[in-house]
From Swiss-Prot:
Protein family: Belongs to the sirtuin family. Class U subfamily.
InterPro entries: DHS-like_NAD/FAD-binding_dom, NAD-dep_sirtuin_deacylases, Sirtuin, Sirtuin_cat_small_dom_sf, Sirtuin_class_U, Ssirtuin_cat_dom
Lineage of producing organism: Bacteria, Bacillati, Bacillota, Bacilli, Bacillales
Coarse class of the protein's main subcellular location: cytoplasm
Recorded GO CC terms: cytoplasm
Statement: the UniProt record of this protein carries the keyword Metal-binding: yes
Name of protein: NAD-dependent protein deacetylase
Free-text comment on the cofactor: Binds 1 zinc ion per subunit.
Length: 243
């Protein structure tokens, strides 16, 4: 492990165009449940009697707007979550002008909360909301502080700005993410199993020097990586920052 940390530190210190690609594992230490792991959010919301895929779908929003709103308020608004050391480390490297930014599969908004400026949120963010009817914009604090569920302009359902099942990923976001990957000298994957498509397929566009994967479980890209660390990333980053 120590040799891996030394290698990781050397690569990070010698890189000036790092792109980060993050998944659910990054936010677990902040109290955000991993969607797909055993005991994760999908397991938990399955207890509601409807499939998680349906509850997080465009169809459910259209079939039962009130039910969809209530589900979002009950299950998705992580009020007390704060960035952890991994989010802070990524933001610090961006401030130090070593990083091109971060691409994330997460919807919790914690990268932005940590101070990262160049964040491509592939699946949207819970930091923004909008009316499903008239598209008036709302912030997360609007929704939480005022317990807003319906638009004060037209009465429509206020939905989070996330990509639901049955909706397409935002193409400008995909283009920005591809640009970050294609121009990176080092790509660091953190807390992602790299199996959810099409987002995970972006990794195949990396042509730089070093692919680093830090994840508890194996990924389909492990054999292509310069360095693979199967460990808790909070522990890895803490150790890295004390090296």
């Amino acid at each position: 492990m120590r040799n891996d940390l030394e290698t990781l530190k050397h690569i990070i210190d010698s890189s000036n165009r790092i792109t980060f690609f993050t998944g659910a594992g990054v936010s677990v230490a902040s109290g955000v449940p991993d969607f797909r792991s055993m005991g994760g959010l999908f397991d938990e919301i399955s207890k509601d009697g409807l499939s998680p895929e349906y509850l997080l779908s465009r169809d459910y929003l259209e079939d039962d707007p009130e039910g969809f709103i209530n589900f979002c308020h009950k299950r998705l608004l992580f009020v007390d979550t704060k960035p952890n050391i991994v989010h802070d480390w990524i933001a610090k490297l961006e401030r130090n002008q070593q990083s091109l930014g971060v691409i994330t599969q997460n919807i919790d908004g914690l990268h932005s909360d940590a101070g990262s400026q160049h964040v491509d949120e592939l699946h949207g963010t819970l930091n923004r909301f909008y009316c499903n009817a008239c598209h008036k914009s709302y912030t997360k604090s609007d929704v939480i502080d005022r317990t807003l569920k319906h638009c004060d302009n037209c009465g429509g359902a206020i939905r989070p700005d996330i990509v639901l099942y049955g909706e397409m990923l935002d193409q400008p976001t995909i283009i920005r993410a591809l640009n970050k990957i294609e121009h990176a000298d080092t790509l660091v994957v953190l807390g992602s199993s790299l199996v959810v498509q099409p987002a995970a397929g972006l990794i195949s566009h990396f042509k730089g020097d070093n692919l680093i994967i830090i994840n508890k479980d194996r990924t389909p890209y492990d054999s292509d990586a310069t360095l693979v660390i199967h460990d808790d990333m909070v522990s890895v980053v803490k150790s890295l920052m004390t090296e």
